[in-house]
């Protein structure tokens, strides 16, 4: 399993959620993230960013590393926006939809926490941190 595959499966699962219809879901590894988030915030006043997963091995003594992949899903909104569907709402929906979600070929996602932060004068975000037990093979293998 490659970390990008986990990220793409999470993005696909969120894109299919009816309650998040119309909310752009951005995958961090797919090009210029800063401008894509700014464009989404400018057009839709909110978006969801699926960040690049991290990985903490519990064993790397073999050709396949076993451990925990950590993924952060950020629900971002304009601070001045009073429209229905705040970043907090989106984060709670994402946590609910993704917690215990089986990810084919990987395992089951588990929600670890939700936190908030102000990104700048115009935007704030709620981050949902998820983990999944998985193994990483050789990234050069197809």
Located regions from the model:
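Charged, amphipathic alpha-helical segments and their flanking helix caps
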Residues: 1-30, 35-142
């Amino acid at each position: 399993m490659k970390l990008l595959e986990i990220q793409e499966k999470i993005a696909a699962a969120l894109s299919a959620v009816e309650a998040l219809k119309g909310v752009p879901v951005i995958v961090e590894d797919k090009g210029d993230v800063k401008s894509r988030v700014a464009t989404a915030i400018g057009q839709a006043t909110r978006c969801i960013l699926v960040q690049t997963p991290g990985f903490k091995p519990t064993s790397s003594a073999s050709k396949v590393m076993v451990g925990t992949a950590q993924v952060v899903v950020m629900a971002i909104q304009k601070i001045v926006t009073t429209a229905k569907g705040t970043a907090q709402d989106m984060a709670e929906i994402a946590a609910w939809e993704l917690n215990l979600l089986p990810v084919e070929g990987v395992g089951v996602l588990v929600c670890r926490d939700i936190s908030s932060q102000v990104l700048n004068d115009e935007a704030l975000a709620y981050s949902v941190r998820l983990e999944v037990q998985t193994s990483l093979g050789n990234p050069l293998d197809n």
